[in-house]
Amino acid sequence: MRPLLERLARSTLVCLVVVLSASSIAEEDEQKSTRLYVLDCGYMDMAGWQGFQTFYGFPESAVAIPAQANPCFLVVNQGQSLLWDAGLSDATPSTPVMTEYGVRFSLKSKLAKQLQDLNYPPEKIDYLALSHLHFDHIGNLPYFVNVKTLIQRDEWNAAKDAGPNDIGYNRRSYSPLEDFTKLILLDGDLDVFGDGKVTVFRTPGHTPGHQSLIVHLDQHGPIVISGDVIHFTEELGALNEASDDAAPGEPASALAKLFSRVEEIGGELWVQHDPVQDKARKYAPEYYE
C-alpha cells in the first residue's frame, strides 16, 4: 500500500509542477502580449447643443449629433500599463443630469472599479496619458496623483492661462495636477515604453497641446485613437468647411496630421467620442491584442 501511496504522491507532485509551469508560461505570454481594453468613462447627451458652431466656428449646417460616447482606454504592454484619459468623474450619476454646459452627463460604471476588476487598480497604473485637459477627459485625476502622467507642455500652459469663458477648461477639474508627484510635460511625441508599441503624438488644434495615441497590436494591427481632433465621423464635412483657411495647429491641420499617421502605419482610426464606432467596440473585460 505504501509504494502505491508514494507513487500517487509523486504523480500528484508532477501534475502540480506541470500546472504551475503552464501557469507561469501563460502569465509570461500575457505580459508579452500588448492588450487594449476599452473602458466606460461616461456618456454625454448633447441634443440641441450648439457648441460646435459657437465655440469652434462650424457653419450652421454642421450636423448635430445627439449623443457622444466618452471611453477611456487601458493598454497593457510587457507587464506595464498606460491609461488613456480619465473620463467623467466617478461621482457622475447614472441618470443623466444637466450641467452648466448644457449637456446631460451620465456614468454607468465607475473607472476605479473597472480598473480594479482588471487587476490594474489606479495606484498600480504605470502611466496616465491625457489627450487634453478638458473636463470630460480628466474627471478622475485624484486617483492618479502618484502615477507618471503625460501631457504636452503647451496644454498645461493653455489650461492655466484659460479665462472663465474658455470652453472645456475647468480649474476644478485640472487643479489636482498641481499636486501630482510625477507630472511629465512633453514637447513633442513620445514612444512611451521604448519598444514602438505605444506612442503619444502631438495633434494641436482642438486645444493648443492636444495629443493622440497609437497602439500597435500584434493580431488586430495598429490603432490610432483620435482624442478630440475629431468627435464623430459625420463631423468631417463641417470641419473641412469651417477650416478651409486654418493655420497650422488649427483643426484642419491636426486632422491632416492624424490621417497622415493612420496612413503611414496602415492603422485603424478610432474616433474616440463617435457613438456609432463605440457601439461596435468590445468593452472590458474583453480586449484587443
Residue ranges and their predicted role:
Residues 11-20:
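Bacterial N-terminal signal peptides
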Residues 90, 101-113, 214, 219-289:
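Cap/insert and terminal regions of metallo-dependent hydrolase folds
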Residues 96-151:
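Active-site metal-binding motif and surrounding structural segment of the metallo-beta-lactamase
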Residues 1-12:
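Bacterial N-terminal signal peptides that target proteins for export
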Residues 41-42, 86-88, 133, 154, ...:
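Active-site metal-binding loops of divalent metal-dependent hydrolases
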Residues 20-124, 152-202, 220-227, 250-266, ...:
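Metallo-beta-lactamase
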Residues 135-141, 205, 209, 279-289:
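Short, electropositive alpha-helical surface patch
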